[in-house]
């Protein structure tokens, strides 16, 4: 099984944390959110992981070079010189085939990937979107009108929606509908629907946090601290990891990875890195 992790975002909503580290390396418990994602995918049977990186991507390469990842797992890095969007970034990966997972690099979840993929195959879909219930509180009174007259008044209602979890299963045929250049995921969905392709919706009730804002980051951290076993950690948590200066000139060959400067010399931007 293969997975793609989108890890190139600027993380502007999570500042000041992301001024010095990329959002996927923000610590949740005793490890970065990116390592939570990778470990859960490996547990689900993923054998090859492609990371699309950009903002502070060198730090991601250096971190994963020393992370506790089985050497049998193949990691590939793909650089975006300019933003290509949440769907367009897939165009930097030259050999995507069959069925594969795509997910944002800032998602903490206990989703069952095996169940998600089985659902995707059952639906015979070109694309499956994992969804989660989300409540939006309106802090004002909502007025419903008709022809200039008030018909209803609802004080501070709570609205419920099904929202994307930032986790998807692609069939390779979905990639045929990518345009040249940047493309956001919603645009790809509309292109698929216009072409008559099947886009499935997987309802998920697992724990899920989109680590895109300071508030969500703090809620995710609190959940991991209270229930570490859900996320594959020991009940007694050490302090979150600290960032130390690293020597990006150092060769690291144990996992077939190289620090940023060596990778930059050996890898064409926008293409596939050595692995």
Predicted regions and their residues:
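A structural signal for short hydrophobic beta-strand segments in well-ordered beta-sheet cores
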Residues: 25, 142-145, 201
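Catalytic-core segments of class I nucleotidyltransferases/pyrophosphorylases
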Residues: 101, 108, 114-121, 134-137, ...
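A generic "binding-loop/recognition-motif" signal
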Residues: 10, 21, 56, 107, ...
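Conserved N-terminal catalytic core of the sugar/cofactor nucleotidyltransferase
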Residues: 2-5, 27, 31-104, 110, ...
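A short, conserved acidic/glycine-rich loop-to-beta-strand motif
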Residues: 123-132
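Hydrophobic packing residues within well-ordered alpha-helices of enzyme cores
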Residues: 14, 60-64, 220
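Short, high-confidence coil segments that cap the C-terminus of an alpha-helix
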Residues: 46, 97, 124-125, 196-197
